[in-house]
């Protein structure tokens, strides 16, 4: 599998390699914390501007247009906010997420599925590792590396003090089930 990943990695344009790796480890960033998530979003912004000519064609996509109008309404709401200084960073974060989505769309449309399948394989592996850890913690009261949740009735898994493993599983279950269903229907 390593040879396959290495061969496929060589077929990626140099300007896309860094964001491809970042996108591959995105689920881990959710486990590690906000700093890594923000670094990933920052790298998406850099990749967006490096590939602006390719990315700009997605501005005509209906979903992106809807997100853009949503963003504009949030900007207008900032002006009517009681505390605009406090509201503006939250609104700008929406723009960063929009750029992140455009970069993902650009990568998925630029490369063929066999290359992108590596991302889904790694995401599925991370998902199942965390899922196994959740069941381990439910059964034994601590996770596989010895962490215990602050609340005995809640599971934290690798997230430490943050009790967000349910949201993680809920979010990535959609990707995992979608990937496995696509793979089964296309006999990959």
Range-by-range predicted roles:
Residues 86-93, 150-156:
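Non-cytosolic membrane-interface motifs at loop->transmembrane helix junctions
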Residues 1-89, 102, 106-124, 179-188:
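Transmembrane signal-anchor hairpin modules in multi-pass inner-membrane enzymes, especially those
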Residues 24-26, 75, 117-150, 157-188:
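Alpha-helical transmembrane segments of multi-pass inner-membrane proteins
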Residues 31-39, 90, 156-170:
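Membrane-interface micro-motifs in multi-pass membrane enzymes
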């Amino acid at each position: 599998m390593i040879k396959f990943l290495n061969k496929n990695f060589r077929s990626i344009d140099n300007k896309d390699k860094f964001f491809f790796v970042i996108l591959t480890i995105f689920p881990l960033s959710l486990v590690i914390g906000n700093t890594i998530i923000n670094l990933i979003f920052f790298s998406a912004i850099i990749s967006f501007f490096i590939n602006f000519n390719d990315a700009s064609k997605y501005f005509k996509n209906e979903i992106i247009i809807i997100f853009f109008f949503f963003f504009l309404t949030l900007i207008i709401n900032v002006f009517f906010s009681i505390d605009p200084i406090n509201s503006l960073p939250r609104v700008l974060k929406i723009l960063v997420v929009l750029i992140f989505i455009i970069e993902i769309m650009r990568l998925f449309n630029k490369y063929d599925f066999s290359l992108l399948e590596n991302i889904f394989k790694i995401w599925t592996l991370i998902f199942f590792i965390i899922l196994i850890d959740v069941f381990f913690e439910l059964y034994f009261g601590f996770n596989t590396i010895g962490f215990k949740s602050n609340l005995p009735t809640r599971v934290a898994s690798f997230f430490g003090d943050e009790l967000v493993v349910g949201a993680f599983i809920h979010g990535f279950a959609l990707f995992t089930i979608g990937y496995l269903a696509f793979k089964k229907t296309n006999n990959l």
